[in-house]
Amino acid sequence: MDIRTAVRVGVMVIAGTVSGAQQAAAMQPAGSATAPDTPGTGPYPAMKEEIPALARNVVYRPANVAAMGARKLGVVAWGNGGCSNDAASTRFHLLELASHGYLVIASGRILSGPGAPPASGERLPFPQTVPGDLIAAIDWALAENTRQGSPYFGRIDPKQVAVAGFSCGGLQAALVAGDPRIATVIMQNTGTYEGERSTMPGLKVPKSTLKKFHTPVLYIIGGPTDVAYTNAMEDFALIDHVPVAMANLPVGHGGTYHEPNGGAAAQVAVDWLNWQLRGDAQGRARFIGANCGLCTDPKWTLEKKNFPAP
């Protein structure tokens, strides 16, 4: 079963019929929705917050930005599973990224976990978020970098911008990947498809979307039982113009988002961001070389192409 048929029973179909808070509860394992936030394992313990000036997004950041000293923040714009408006639905994963010195901006509001309001039960149409929310996140972050009085004034590196997302949110990331400010893309548990799905009315993400990629791309997929597996592997085969890596961990479509600190997939995402945005040698070593970290880890299957020879 690939994502084109599985969306009827997967998280994407939920987005068109229930509230963001109800969808978040459906997507998260029992107990996960009520678990406390985790600060991440990076050097900068992280937090999440809603900012009035950013009405359609939630910010994940180091709790003490000043502790970074002269080091600059990178920016990651994030699309949620189901294109939902619950920006806390993958909070452990996003807090982990933020703890490594990234300003992660997720579409939506806090609708699950700590800080969430009671579920309203309101039925919202699909999609609850749009690709433009990712662009708005990048716009806001880069504007804050130059705004006198902003807590982020001069603290963001505008060359360190990534876009990423889970499932339907990954499709949103693909749709905006042509933005020249974006330096890398992470596609998680997702892949493009031809046509239009009744469960995702109006969302068209054909294979031609892959031509928008102008930077290195990482796919993190849940193995053959992931409903996005077939579409993602088709994408990997078709991408011939930019470096692309395909990292498969056999955990299914739900990934490791709800494991402590986002689990194994979050660590791979951090290593990729550190390599692609900061030139980090340790991050590079997870992907490149005959004895690369993912190459020798029996839990992962790594494929890659179009990279310069090591």
Describe the role of every protein-language-model region.
Residues 27-71:
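N-terminal cap/lid segment of alpha/beta-hydrolase-fold proteins
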Residues 70-81:
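Short beta-strand element of the alpha/beta-hydrolase
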Residues 75, 101-108, 184, 245:
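A fold-wide structural signal in alpha/beta-hydrolase
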Residues 88-107:
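Short amphipathic alpha-helix adjacent to the substrate-entry channel of hydrolases
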Residues 165-169, 173:
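Gly/Ala-rich beta-loop-alpha elbow adjacent to hydrolase catalytic centers
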Residues 183-259:
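The feature captures the conserved acid-bearing segment of alpha/beta-hydrolase catalytic domains
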Residues 251-254, 259-310:
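Alpha/beta-hydrolase-fold serine-hydrolase catalytic core, especially in secreted/extracellular enzymes
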